[in-house]
Each structure stands twice: as C-alpha cells, then as structure tokens.
Design a protein with these regions (language model features):
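Long extracytoplasmic/lumenal interhelical loops at the membrane interface
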Residues: 275-333, 352
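Hydrophobic alpha-helical membrane-interfacial segments at the cytosolic entry of transmembrane helices
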Residues: 73-76, 130-139, 203-206, 239-260
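Transmembrane signal-anchor hairpin modules in multi-pass inner-membrane enzymes, especially those
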Residues: 1-85, 120-124, 130, 187-199, ...
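Alpha-helical transmembrane segments of multi-pass inner-membrane proteins
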Residues: 123-154, 166-235
Length: 405
C-alpha cells in the first residue's frame, strides 16, 4: 500500500509539472526561469535518487523479472550518455552546449527512470500522465492563440506565424488534438449530463489544438491526426457505430459551418508542400553525414555532446540541433550511438504496438506525436516526448484502459 501511495504522489507531481509546462514554460526554453525550476524540481522528486543510482551503477541489470525492454534501454542510456560526453569534453565543447544535449537525452530515457517507479499504481499513473499531457497541449494551444490575437478567421486564409518559442511544436499539442476529441465523442454517446458536459469540453479542447495546427500549417501533425481519426473511425464503425455517428455528425456540422476555413487549410497545406517540400531535410542529412565522415573517431563516436553543426536548414548557422533524431544522433554520437538508440527504441516499439491493440484510442493518441517527434521533427528533444514514451510503456504493460468511453 505504501508503494502504491508513493507511486501516486510521483504521478501527481508529474501531472502538476505538465500543467506548469503547458501554461508557463516553452517546449525548448532558452533559460531557466522560476517555472522551469519548479518543473525540474517536480521531475527530480518524481524520479527520486535511488532509481537513477541503480541505473548509473548497473544495479538494474542484475534485477530479475524486469521486462525485456529494460536491459537494452539501460545499456543504451550508458552508451549514449558517457561516450558522447567524454568525446565532448575531449574536444573542449562549451559546457552549456553539452548540457543542452544531455538534458534532452535524459528526457528521451524517462521510461527507464519512471516506469518502474509507477508500476505500483499503473491505472492512476496512466490517467494522470494522459491528463497532464492533454492539459499541457491545450495550454500551449491557448497561449499560441493568444499571441495570434485569437485570429480564428485567418485559418485557411493565410499561414499564421509559429511565434518565437514554437509552442505548437510540442508533441502534447498533437496528443491533445487526437485524444480529447476521441475520448470526448465517446463520453457524449453515453453517461449522465456531467459526463456529457465533460465530453463537450474535451471535444472543444481538442478542436482548439487541431485548428491551431491548421492555422500554423503544421503539415505532419495534421496528416498524423487525420490518419489517427481514420483508423479509429474504421475501428469504431465495427465496435461502436453510435460513436462514429456522433463523430461524423460533429465533423459534418463543422464542415457546413466553416467550409472556407476547412478547404482553405487544405489548400495551405498543399501550397506549403509545393513551396517548402521537405524543408531542406535532405541537405541537413547530408551535412550531418559529412560531419560524421570527417574522421574515423567521428564516424564511430560522433562529435560528442555540445558539438555544433553548420545546418543548411537554418541558413548555414552553426547550431546544436538537427530536425531529425537520426541525423542528430549520427552527428553527435556516431554509428555506435545510433545503434544504441535503435536498440532502445526498438525495444519500446512492441509496447506501443501492444497499446494500439489493447487501447486503440490512447495508442493512436500516443503514436502520432511519437512518430512526429522521433521521425522528422526537433521535438524529440522535448520533455513531453519522454513522458509520452513513459505513458505508452506503462499503459501497455498493464493493459491499461482509460475510463470507459
């Protein structure tokens, strides 16, 4: 019972951290302000000291009964932390630049640190993590709408600016855009008036995120959301036709009320694709490969944490990031680090697939943002990516379903 209570407190702390993250912080904050300090403190309290020490010393490798993904994950974390860190120190990169690489690495490996601590209360922990991510996503969307001066009429007319801190790049925005309408429609189809009111609020929150992504013409996020809704629609057509009728009715009503915005947004996506193409991702990959091939040491171990890359995607400026996880890992950690990363994510992939089978709504809500973050987006460095991975693994391990829809 004590273990369950501690797990609940950890999950509650993570929920509060996510709420503060969405309402007061940024996906990639430039400095540590009071909000970031509080979020960091809550994360440290959630993780504790014992689990990181066990991971750092290799004690977790001796534990029996661990799921098959944990051992390769712990080994991958050791390789990706220490080899590039020593390489960065050897090449005398700036300490601040090294920290900006190491912290996102720890975010990405949050499942290693958090999942074992939350297993004592998986149901509540999954609910709190999912709720926190949804609130964070809506918070980011609201703040973006505020800086856009609530210009809903501009959607489909012109591409709206992302803003200086790229609030909509947070994977939690796409998570909320998929999860909230999906769960909300289910809540509308059955239950009392309180449940239906909550369903209306969920649908509106999700639509707020979706329309924001359409206004800023986030092509990949919109495409992944469309795939998720199509997959869920086909599933529900067989299992819950009433929910499909409800969702179809809402979609038809919105298309009837706002045809210019809907078709205009589709036109904006097509126009951006024509003008921007792949957003110089191929040129960026070529630059990362060139840096990796600059020497045998760079090929094996990369240039280390803290290295900068002359990135064609940002006009040739020397920056600490690339826009895809593969090129980032290749440039910074070399082939050795890239193999460790593949082993880690490959170990988690069956968990995500299992979640798609056991809880399709949560599975699709998690899969879309993760595909975006880990495939072709800088958001692989963000806090919510690591917590989405944590949510997926924890939910899959316990066959968790959120409240009946």
């Amino acid at each position: 019972m004590a273990g369950k209570g501690v797990a609940l407190w950890r999950a509650a702390g993570l929920f509060v951290a996510l709420v503060l993250y969405g309402l007061l912080s940024a996906p990639a904050p430039a400095e540590i302000r009071p909000a970031e300090a509080v979020i960091g403190a809550l994360l440290v309290l959630g993780v504790g000291l014992l689990r990181p020490l066990c991971v750092a010393t290799g004690q977790t490798l001796l534990e029996r009964g661990s799921p098959p993904w944990e051992m390769p994950a712990v080994l991958a974390l050791a390789v990706l932390l220490w080899c590039p860190l020593m390489r960065g120190v050897w090449l005398d990169w700036a300490p601040g630049d090294m920290v900006r690489d190491v912290v996102p690495l720890l975010y990405l490996f949050l499942p290693v640190l958090l999942v074992p601590l939350l297993r004592a209360a998986p149901d509540r922990a999954v609910g709190l993590l999912a709720g926190g991510l949804a609130v964070a996503g809506v918070g980011f969307a609201l703040r973006w709408w505020k800086q856009a001066e609530w210009g809903f009429g501009a959607v489909g007319v012109r591409a709206m600016a992302d803003g200086g801190v790229y609030l909509l790049n947070a994977p939690s925005v796409l998570f909320a855009a998929i999860a909230l309408p999906a769960f909300g429609v289910g809540m509308l189809t059955r239950g009392g008036w309180l449940r239906r009111a909550a369903g209306v609020a969920a649908v509106l929150g999700g639509l707020l995120c979706l329309v924001a992504l359409a206004g800023a013409v986030h092509r990949m996020a919109l495409g992944l959301a469309a795939i998720a809704f199509a997959a869920l629609g086909l599933l529900w057509l067989r299992r819950a036709p009433l929910a499909v009728l409800g969702a179809g009715g809402i979609a038809l009503l919105l298309a009837t009320l706002f045809p210019e915005a809907l078709f205009g947004a589709l036109g904006q996506v097509a126009e951006k694709t024509r003008l921007a193409g792949a957003n110089t991702r191929w040129e960026e990959a070529e630059a990362a490969l060139g840096q990796a091939l600059s020497s045998p040491a760079a090929f094996l171990f990369g240039q280390g944490w803290g290295a900068l890359l002359a990135n064609p995607a940002v006009g040739g400026w020397r920056v600490s990031y690339t826009h895809t996880l593969v090129t980032y890992a290749l440039a910074k950690t070399g082939v050795v680090g890239l193999c460790a990363l593949i082993a880690y994510l490959g170990g988690l992939a069956p968990r995500v697939l299992a979640l798609l089978r056991s809880d399709p709504v949560l599975g699709w809500a998690v899969s879309g943002p993760l595909l975006m973050a880990l495939g072709a987006h800088t958001s692989f460095k963000y806090l919510d990516t690591g917590l989405l991975l944590t949510l997926a693994v924890l939910a899959a391990e316990r066959g968790k379903r959120l409240p009946p829809r």
